[in-house]
């Protein structure tokens, strides 16, 4: 009884963790047997009390937290404000997503924290409360889902779904919430079916890698270890203790002169407490990494057995235990309910709050303006910043650490408890982050603008990928667009009044022209959209005006001037103009039926400089027979050397060499028959035959002469050469005359008579056998080429003279190269010469015209006749049309910046939409011509009243660069406006003349600031659009065949009695961008966002636009001024997000690490870290042997990194796995090296995978250095690269493994467990271990001097041992110097 009296009575609630602690203390104190006896009594007590209480769970026990309603309401309010900010362009999509997730995460966490106090106050004996908070059943997360809110879910890929589940399971879920819940929850099909098997397969692979690792020795004698430092607080206390307990020391631990622990002592709780108390130097512990046994492990490197707390027994199969320990939590945790831990929080940020109301003061030079990750403006401080908060009687000082955000401005008044700064937590950098790309898509179509300079990203210099250097807005100026199959053409002058309904979707876009006195007079109209299918044409005769050619150059045939009938054979890209001219000198040409000028334009519409515009086949140069074309004479070398007309991508181009004068050429006729191999030939090679000799059964020769038969591939070519045969006397005389042309008037060289030739002849040497040869003299038809038909006269000269110095000139060229055989196919004739019309234009430096133009045929209907015009635009860029094969209506655009876009609605299907819009407004508009700054091209804009919004009238508005007089004339013209909101609109054109050039200054404005500042002019002008009042803008920029839909312009008239929001008057300048809700006049309407289009004395017109915010480093797609369509990618943000902490996302990540698949973040971090290490080492030790140690350190470093990554995933789930299990696995993955050179050729092959220790030992035995490279094998590859082929074959690819093993004659020593199980032997583990293994002699511990100033703090000292020979040979003198000095220690934190 006396003993009982001394016991202390603890009156406390004991929960799961307390019981764990109690049990471990009991085991330490009383041992196993007694502890189990105590625990039996505790169990009996527990059951007895539970029965007496009759505890049970009912649905009424789930009490909802009362504060939930207003918390959720508050979060919704915040989300709404956030949505607005995003709409105004203050935050971008990524920031919005981040902030909304954090808002809901915080709400959910508040609710969770409320839960425990709520239960304690309202119902302390609630069964749910008792069970979950004691740890008996369920955890806080699960109860929170039952009575709080389910919160945010993540989808199976680990991305957060930003719509939170606000209900809890007690209230029941709505349909949407239920679907999200199924998508993200752990009970889905995905998890039960797929992930369980994944976890099982992971376990199988893990066990496969390490099944042969058994404890087979007490001590391997290593002197290496991994150092863990108690001083550095990089590790949480709990993990530090967990790392140390159960390990064995690799080195003596000194405290001053006193040794407090010796080498090979195992670490218990008492020793850890002593280490923590003394704050000793780094502690070096032994790990499986440092064990020197090749294929097993020793007791001391493994440490205590987790089951009974003593050193591990010999024969323990620790490999299989390790594999199971890592795989097992996976199978358990896949089916867990969802856990929202730490997603997107990016390290919990601590807030600094103001203690009382007052003014803030700090040094502004030490801070730098930036944006927080939520898009709020803030200041970033680089070093410690002192912030002073002053009120009337108190002064409070706060120190804010570096890298923190200051959320207030200098001299700002703050209220009590207001957040003034956000401090990044220390754990921030340790988080596993992955880089995610987020694409932002345009949700409207229109024209793109930037409000800042944009850099080309270096790897895509010539593409449309740009990098933003600073935070700025991208604007999409509104306006729809239509794509056209033909190039739209239109001829308008400035200030024209027009009314056109230009887009006629069903019919071709045909306008009517009448040609009078060489002036083109237009009646502009088109058919109205009515339900009737016939063509109804309205003629607005009062709109007739003489309109000169604007940007387009028309080249039209002179025939049009004479109003002669024009019959054009129409193809899509080519037509032929028949000759009907009655000039005498050309009459003979016209007799031939086939003659005619062909004009052809490449299918893509691109016409190159000096390209062929039209060609004419002269009938005088046609031949009916095959033959060979030759140029020039023997004396005059042929000028054109086998150059053909080069056709590439459908573009005909004449090379400059062609335009040299070939005054005459020669045609050598020959008869050619092409026969199949099987046909029987009735004549012999080199025989001479007469006319009409049968050659095969059904063909006869048309000329007589020498027969030559050649076999080519799968056919036989039989040629008949007409001409005379001579047998020359001496061989060398004739050799140089084989295959030459001899002009008339020369003597024959190969006969004794000197006869003069009358005609040209062609001499060719023929060798039927080796000794015999003879000469064949063949007749030749010479052709003279005159200057040719002057095609240029067909085209009037004026369009070329006026502009751009375009020239047409006729060029004759020969279709066949010198000495090239021409083949006649069936009954066609061969055209030898073609006369071409070459179009070129001057390329002087001032007008920077490209090498290419856009050309197209335009069909014009005049008085019932259809005329064809050729339209040529000199442009810089172009768009190709590619017709899809099966779909005639859809076409794709590929512009020259390589961005592909598919036109979703083909041309013919827009009829129904267009008709509805067409019926809306019929009013007049005004054309205005915009001039580009470098005067390359003009463009038109037509504006009308119904599509602008207007602000005004203002009295005090200041304008930039605007002449007041031009504003004061404000003639209002009446406009017939059927459905527009207003009856009047100012005559827009007047103001354009003075303001329009200003639009090129790219100004922007920032919401909330009333001073709207000018930005510097950065870019080219607006693009050129033609706006029709019926709701479309026609893009008149000739480089794109795209018509833009109407710009939404709105007119605003505020009331006259108004006051300004600020005393300073708002400055509005033309072309400036205004964000939504910028207040210009107090009583005026709230503006929509847009670009100021027109400024007048009392009002402004704004073209509506949508801003998108982009932060530095974002990638902008598309060019400035480019037309974008809905759904096009606009910007790509790259941002870092914390890995989702859920184990189901965790398992694939564990597997990625173990299988060494490269994920961006892992490979980046590891490689960078290793590079950094190698640099450090060489800096510390000097180059030569820094590399040797660098290799060792690389392996050690990557091993530690892998262990930490795997631990991280499990710890985030509250799963405790001892490091040594993971270390055993990682050791197997990293223990192989790749033999790189043939330095070891007598032992290993290059490219062979061998164990690291084996390579080192072989190197020492052979006394030569080995070249090898450390490799990370994945667990699958490691399982297939073991010493036992039976184990490999039973894992995967059985046939391949066995076949290889047979070829190599491998021997399996049956050292592992699996081989023995397969063959039915006794496994070498446990009791079977002693019988099988003969003790190999224990290695004597290598005695190395371990002084206090040891090398690398006990980390790498045995490098000397491994590479002693290498060191001795190279550095025998250096070592003596270095041994005396102390080296800088390098430590690996086992964190």
Curated annotation (Swiss-Prot):
This enzyme's EC code(s): 2.7.7.6
Q: How is the cofactor bound?
A: Binds 1 Zn(2+) ion per subunit.
* UniProt keywords, alphabetically: Chloroplast, DNA-directed RNA polymerase, Metal-binding, Nucleotidyltransferase, Plastid, Transcription, Transferase, Zinc
One Gene Ontology CC term in the entry: DNA-directed RNA polymerase complex
Which class of enzymes does this protein belong to? transferase
Alphabetical GO biological process terms? DNA-templated transcription
Q: What cofactor is needed?
A: Zn(2+)
The record's subcellular locations are:
Plastid, Chloroplast
Binding locations of Zn(2+): 220, 291, 298, 301
Annotated GO MF terms? DNA binding; DNA-directed RNA polymerase activity; zinc ion binding
InterPro entries xref list: DNA-dir_RpoC2_beta_pp, RNA_pol_beta''_euk, RNA_pol_Rpb1_3_sf, RNA_pol_Rpb1_4, RNA_pol_Rpb1_5, Rpb1_funnel_sf
Q: Which reaction does it catalyse?
A: RNA(n) + a ribonucleoside 5'-triphosphate = RNA(n+1) + diphosphate
Task: Specify whether Zinc is a keyword of the entry.
Answer: yes
SUPFAM superfamilies reported for this sequence: beta and beta-prime subunits of DNA dependent RNA-polymerase (SSF64484)
* NCBIfam families (UniProt xref): rpoC2_cyan
The family note in this entry says: Belongs to the RNA polymerase beta' chain family. RpoC2 subfamily.
Q: How does it assemble?
A: In plastids the minimal PEP RNA polymerase catalytic core is composed of four subunits: alpha, beta, beta', and beta''. When a (nuclear-encoded) sigma factor is associated with the core the holoenzyme is formed, which can initiate transcription.
Q: What does this protein do?
A: DNA-dependent RNA polymerase catalyzes the transcription of DNA into RNA using the four ribonucleoside triphosphates as substrates.
Its protein name is DNA-directed RNA polymerase subunit beta''
Give the source species: Gossypium barbadense
Q: Which gene encodes it?
A: rpoC2
